[in-house]
Amino acid sequence: MYTARKKIQKDKGVEPSEFEDTVAQAFFDLENGNQELKSDLKDLYINTAIQMDVVGNRKAVVIHVPYRLRKPFRKIHVRLVRELERVSGKDVVFVATRRIVRPPKKGSAVQRPRTRTLTAVHDGILEDVVYPAEIVGKRVRYRLDGAKVIKIYLDPKERNNTEYKLETFSAVYRRLCGKDVVFEYPVAETA
């Protein structure tokens, strides 16, 4: 029988939490109720879902999807996020599941793929968090006390879709990667 349990696939022996079951049920309901998303959602599933507090009373739902299903999710990202936010009343962010591999030991002939380095994983998570906006610039500012603040400039074309979520983006990224990030839109220079 086809149920909402098929929409969440976790590691062997790990049971989904109650919150993850509700997210999987929302996916299942969207697939059965929404005709325009039905064919796109048919083969898609999620790995995990976490709920986190954002500035103020708002909450965010971070949904981890398998890395190889990243492209199909991005194809329907805007519609899917709109529907899930309407149902839940929370900000929804999709992030691909990535794995960091420790650097190889001295003298080891094993090569570590670039996609498995800490830097590449954190950059990938950053791109996933701000999607559908694109990152057009990045500045790192070091404060006098040694703290590091990263300024991310987003594409102004997607301002209408993403401006209300900027605090959510920075809170989610801080929770996932432990780095302080400020999101801005570059000021257009008029000649």
Swiss-Prot record:
Which top-rank group of organisms is this from?
A: Eukaryota
Q: Which key words tag this protein in UniProt? A: Ribonucleoprotein, Ribosomal protein
**Per its record, what are the GO molecular function terms?**
structural constituent of ribosome
One term under GO cellular component: small-subunit processome
Q: Which GO biological-process labels does this protein carry?
A: ribosomal small subunit biogenesis; rRNA processing; translation
- Tagged with keyword Ribonucleoprotein: yes
What family is it from? Belongs to the eukaryotic ribosomal protein eS7 family.
The protein's name: Small ribosomal subunit protein eS7
